[in-house]
């Protein structure tokens, strides 16, 4: 359990990820009306995001071994966290199956599909940065079970966010932005907020 608590301290800012969970739930709304179901969804979405974050970090352990405060790159800690990851995935599917078997099946296939993608593409550097972002549109899909172009918009929005926020993320069209405004750390978050507000407004027009 010590390895888990240390991992959470190093890699999972609960306050920040709670905000991400709330944002994703808001994006899943068909109209701007919040029910108790949406409130109850927050812990589940947060747990899912934690599980996927852990999955990605363990996949990146070899690459991140030179980085500071990355205890999950230690072989002993990594094995402990791999066990925790498997347990977390089983718990996620079990919780969802208790309430909705269709959603549980969708989650199971997503986890399998995501693992296959990591196995095939993670070592191809141009794909490595994009794979962890698949979890965001999936959260919205699992909440409302409606495939739509909105899922693509959410994925693209998080790609842009990462381009703005992460200096290691492929630059593409934002090279000039990063060179001109290197210290504007608030801009990526303002972009996500603007995207969220735009989506809410469009759904209620």
Where are each of the predicted segments found?
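Multi-pass alpha-helical membrane architecture of UbiA-family
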Residues: 1-205
């Amino acid at each position: 359990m010590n390895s888990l608590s240390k991992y959470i301290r190093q890699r999972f800012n609960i306050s920040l990820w709670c905000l991400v969970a709330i944002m994703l739930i808001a994006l899943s709304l068909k109209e701007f009306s919040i029910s108790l179901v949406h409130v109850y969804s927050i812990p589940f979405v947060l747990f899912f995001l934690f599980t996927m974050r852990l999955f990605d970090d363990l996949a990146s352990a070899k690459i991140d071994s030179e980085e500071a405060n990355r205890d999950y790159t230690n072989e002993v800690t990594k094995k402990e966290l791999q066990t925790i990851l498997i347990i977390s995935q089983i718990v996620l599917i079990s919780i969802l199956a208790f309430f909705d078997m269709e959603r549980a099946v969708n989650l199971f296939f997503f986890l399998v599909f995501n693992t296959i993608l990591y196995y095939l593409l993670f070592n191809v550097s141009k794909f490595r940065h994009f794979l962890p972002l698949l979890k965001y549109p999936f959260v919205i899909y699992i909440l409302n079970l409606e495939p739509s172009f909105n899922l693509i918009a959410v994925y693209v929005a998080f790609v842009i966010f990462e381009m703005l926020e992460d200096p290691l993320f492929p630059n593409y069209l934002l090279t000039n932005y990063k060179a001109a405004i290197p210290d504007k750390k608030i801009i990526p978050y303002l972009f996500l907020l603007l995207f969220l507000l735009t989506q809410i407004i469009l759904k209620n027009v």
